Amino acid sequence: MDRRDYLAYAFAGLGAFLVAFIGLPLFMIFIKQAYDLEALQRTLVDPLVIESIRNSLFTATVSTLLGILFGVPLGYVLARKEFKGKNFVQALIDTPIVIPHSVVGIMLLVTFSDAILDNYKGIVAVMLFVSSPFIVNSARDGFLSVDEKLEYVARTLGASGLRTFFSVTLPNAIHSIASGAIMAWARAISEVGAILIVAYYPKTAQVLIMEYFNNYGLRASRPIAVILVTISLAVFIFLRWLVGRGRNA
């Protein structure tokens, strides 16, 4: 930044507060746990913890894949077509972002009852509900950024609608879709409130952390939190790197 760019320096200073506010808790939880490595070592080999983390990773991944399967086509329709009720559909898609987590759990339980109670389907249903807006909105924005003239040229050259989509539209929107999928996965693996209501079992890492904190206190729950944060950050950074690498290729 230029020395005379006072506005940029002022904004950087204000932004630094938010960076520190987010980064400090991450830094502190690792520092605190470093003084209790024995507890971390025990937690790393605890079968219950291992199973709960596996459940979290599995269900978050499944919900993200389902979100891509159903969300990308919806994003395309919202980007390319005009129809009655479009604004309502877009508002409806954003609704899970503003609904309290516990209310999400109650809504899903009222709707699907025993079909999702205390099973993997319930966990996936919750994660899909809260994370799908990220995929739909990112897909819509990605498709909106694709020049429709490119699709028109492909069609005039004899390509079918489906071939045009997979050879022209999707490749040009893939980075936005991938970014949305990453955010959806992150949102899914962070969900706990609705899962507590819908599917306490099979236990996810989020639920186990809450259980340990309520029953045994901060010291018992902290190692699990450290492990989950480490895995989540590693996956998140790796996926972001892949997307960035593909964008720069």
UniProtKB/Swiss-Prot annotation:
InterPro entries: MetI-like (IPR000515), MetI-like_sf (IPR035906), Mo/W_ABC_Transporter_Permease (IPR053405). Residues 32-56, 118, 201-223 are extracellular. GO terms for cellular component: plasma membrane. It is found in: Cell membrane. Keywords: Cell membrane, Membrane, Molybdenum, Transmembrane, Transmembrane helix, Transport. Its main location: membrane. Residues 1-10, 78-96, 140-179, 245-249 are cytoplasmic. GO terms for biological process: transmembrane transport. It is a multi-pass membrane protein. The chain crosses the membrane at residues 11-31, 57-77, 97-117, 119-139, 180-200, 224-244. It holds the Pfam family BPD_transp_1. Residues 53-239 form the ABC transmembrane type-1 domain. Part of the ABC transporter complex WtpABC involved in molybdate/tungstate import. Probably responsible for the translocation of the substrate across the membrane. The complex is composed of two ATP-binding proteins (WtpC), two transmembrane proteins (WtpB) and a solute-binding protein (WtpA). Belongs to the binding-protein-dependent transport system permease family. This is Molybdate/tungstate transport system permease protein WtpB. It comes from Pyrococcus furiosus (strain ATCC 43587 / DSM 3638 / JCM 8422 / Vc1).
